[in-house]
């Protein structure tokens, strides 16, 4: 087992990474202070790992209940969030009840938001079961739900007590979900660590094959990078926005097609191709680096051309973005691997990128 710490003073927490961690009672025990636990999971993950988690919690002598949500990005909304609150209120959960998010990014984001809101804040633990959630969404305290007009526009910054990333859970992940997680790994290397990007290029096939050593390193290094960014800028006042490389275009794709049509990581992968193209057009990135970025995204079996939503629709959707200011779209662009710039771009350059990178 590897442990990475997120240094946030009195709200610091560990990220435990390894195989077989869902069943290890001792990893949960220090973070559960009250008399009850509510597991929040979904219809796909509960049959796979729910019993193992409940067995791990049993020796703690707590009252354990489970809320099972429908599976998918399409359900990341108020209606599904209320199912969590319904369960908590029905079970008479109190301020010391610990929520445990067992699932991917949708489960983790909604459980964290419910924890932030219920009785104005109860503790929660992240147990991410997808590669995307292990390398990205479970770390850093971003929680929330989608709105029909924009992704993740309603939410809160609320840190977990711990993240327990069991890479053994990745063996049951569908291929599309695995590729979606690799997209976030690629993003992390591209924005923050040129050496890690080199490693990803050399090991993308090992990740595709789910080789445990490659997966463990990808999760560890991604978490180290994200932990250091979050520690420096917890509430995305500046530096943390670099983690949104590929997300301005990507979120537009998700909202434009309808949530769940493309996986989040698929949209981010394509969004990085689009952001790379725009980076070259603005004279920030060299063509050879753009080609390397496109090649590794394609090697991860991610889409490299976006849907033809139309220029006007893309622009409208990208204005509904947390980085936008006074309606002006801001993009995270690459200068070189490991070095980014957050900037506006002329409409003509964006239109040229859309013409080049959409169907």
Swiss-Prot record:
GO terms for biological process: amino acid biosynthetic process; aromatic amino acid family biosynthetic process; chorismate biosynthetic process. Belongs to the sugar phosphate cyclases superfamily. Dehydroquinate synthase family. It comes from the Bacteria. NCBIfam families: aroB (TIGR01357). Pfam families: DHQ_synthase, DHQS_C. The keyword Acyltransferase does not apply. NAD(+) binds at residues 71-76, 105-109, 129-130, 142, 151. Pathway: Metabolic intermediate biosynthesis; chorismate biosynthesis; chorismate from D-erythrose 4-phosphate and phosphoenolpyruvate: step 2/7. Its EC number is 4.2.3.4. Zn(2+) binds at residues 184, 247, 264. Disulfide bonds: none annotated. Its cofactor is Co(2+); Zn(2+); NAD(+). Coiled coil: none annotated. Catalyzes the conversion of 3-deoxy-D-arabino-heptulosonate 7-phosphate (DAHP) to dehydroquinate (DHQ). GO terms for cellular component: cytoplasm. Binds 1 divalent metal cation per subunit. Can use either Co(2+) or Zn(2+). InterPro entries: Dehydroquinate_synthase, DHQ_synth_AroB, DHQ_synth_fam, DHQS/DOIS_N, DHQS_C. It catalyses: 7-phospho-2-dehydro-3-deoxy-D-arabino-heptonate = 3-dehydroquinate + phosphate. Keywords: Amino-acid biosynthesis, Aromatic amino acid biosynthesis, Cobalt, Cytoplasm, Lyase, Metal-binding, NAD, Nucleotide-binding, Zinc. It is found in: Cytoplasm. GO terms for molecular function: 3-dehydroquinate synthase activity; metal ion binding; nucleotide binding. This is 3-dehydroquinate synthase.
């Amino acid at each position: 087992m590897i442990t990475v710490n997120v240094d946030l003073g009195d709200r610091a927490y560990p990220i435990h990474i390894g195989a077989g961690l869902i069943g290890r009672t001792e990893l949960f025990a220090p973070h559960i202070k009250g008399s009850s636990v509510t597991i929040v999971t979904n219809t796909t993950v509960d049959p796979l790992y729910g019993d193992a988690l409940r067995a791990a919690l049993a020796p703690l002598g707590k009252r354990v209940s489970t809320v099972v949500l429908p599976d998918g990005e399409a359900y990341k909304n108020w209606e599904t969030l209320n199912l969590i609150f319904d369960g908590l209120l029905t079970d008479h959960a109190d301020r010391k009840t610990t929520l445990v998010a067992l699932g991917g990014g949708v489960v983790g984001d909604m459980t964290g938001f419910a924890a932030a809101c219920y009785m104005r804040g109860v503790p929660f633990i992240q147990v991410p079961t997808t590669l995307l959630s292990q390398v990205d969404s479970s770390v850093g305290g971003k929680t929330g739900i989608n709105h029909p007009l924009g992704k993740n526009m309603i939410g809160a910054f609320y840190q977990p007590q711990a993240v327990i990333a069991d890479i053994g859970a990745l063996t049951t992940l569908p291929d599309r979900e695995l590729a979606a997680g690799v997209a976030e790994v690629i993003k992390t290397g591209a924005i923050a660590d040129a050496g890690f990007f080199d490693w990803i290029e050399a090991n993308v096939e090992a990740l595709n094959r789910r080789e445990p050593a490659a997966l463990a390193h990808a999760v560890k290094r991604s978490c180290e990078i994200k932990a250091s960014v979050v520690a420096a800028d917890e509430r995305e006042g500046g530096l943390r926005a670099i983690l949104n490389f590929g997300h301005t275009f990507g979120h537009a794709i998700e909202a434009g097609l309808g949530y769940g049509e493309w996986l989040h990581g698929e949209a981010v992968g394509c969004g990085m191709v689009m952001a790379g193209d725009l980076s070259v057009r603005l004279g920030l990135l060299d063509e050879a680096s753009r080609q390397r970025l496109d090649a590794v995204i394609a090697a991860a079996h991610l889409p490299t051309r976006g849907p033809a939503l139309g220029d006007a629709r893309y622009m409208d959707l990208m204005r509904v973005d947390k980085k936008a200011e006074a309606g002006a779209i801001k993009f995270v662009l690459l200068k070189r691997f490991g070095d980014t710039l957050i900037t506006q771009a002329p409409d003509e350059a964006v239109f040229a990128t859309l013409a080049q990178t959409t169907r």
